[in-house]
Amino acid sequence: MAFDETYNEPESTEVLVKSLDPEHPALLRYAHAGDAGADLITTVDVTLKPFERALVPTGVAIALPAGYVALVHPRSGLAAKQGVTVLNAPGTVDAGYRGEIKVPLINLDPKHTAVFHPGDRIAQLVIQRYVEARFIPAETLPGSDRAERGFGSTGVAS
């Protein structure tokens, strides 16, 4: 089968976005076609000393359709180059939440202070469908190959 670019075209859904900061209208947008994450920016100056954390406002609130969740992910470049990441990655924004999306950032670099200014990209927002589970109480669970073997049970190398 020949590669067809439309084959990988993602499905889309509408997400309502409200800008909360008139000085920094923060509309969500994707940096490149095909990106999974839309950039979230800061609307304030933020200085993070080594091992310091802050809850950073983004200036946006969203309304997701039922059956969707927004996940706040770190930006790989910030983590790799500055040691800054999202503390609770991925952060969960439920469909019913209408408040401002805020990002808990932490500077894990032991020596350097990280500085952000309004408009700087600080995280990515990924929209995903989800399945709501029906949790059923059970006295026993069916067997599996893994059973109760947990952390480290598969080894460290193949």
From Swiss-Prot:
Listed Pfam families: dUTPase (PF00692)
Pathway the protein takes part in: Pyrimidine metabolism; dUMP biosynthesis; dUMP from dCTP (dUTP route): step 2/2
Molecular function GO labels: dUTP diphosphatase activity; magnesium ion binding
Names of required cofactors: Mg(2+)
Catalyzed reaction equations: dUTP + H2O = dUMP + diphosphate + H(+)
EC number: 3.6.1.23
The entry's keywords: Hydrolase, Magnesium, Metal-binding, Nucleotide metabolism
Domain of life: Bacteria
Keyword Mitochondrion: no
UniProt xrefs under InterPro entries: dUTPase, dUTPase-like, dUTPase-like_sf, dUTPase_trimeric
SUPFAM superfamilies, A to Z: dUTPase-like (SSF51283)
Residues the entry annotates as binding substrate: 75-77, 88, 92-94, 102
Gene Ontology terms: biological process: dUMP biosynthetic process; dUTP catabolic process
Family, similarity comment: Belongs to the dUTPase family.
Entries under PANTHER family matching the protein: DEOXYURIDINE 5'-TRIPHOSPHATE NUCLEOTIDOHYDROLASE
Stated role: This enzyme is involved in nucleotide metabolism: it produces dUMP, the immediate precursor of thymidine nucleotides and it decreases the intracellular concentration of dUTP so that uracil cannot be incorporated into DNA.
Protein name listed in UniProt: Deoxyuridine 5'-triphosphate nucleotidohydrolase
Organism: Bifidobacterium longum subsp. infantis (strain ATCC 15697 / DSM 20088 / JCM 1222 / NCTC 11817 / S12)
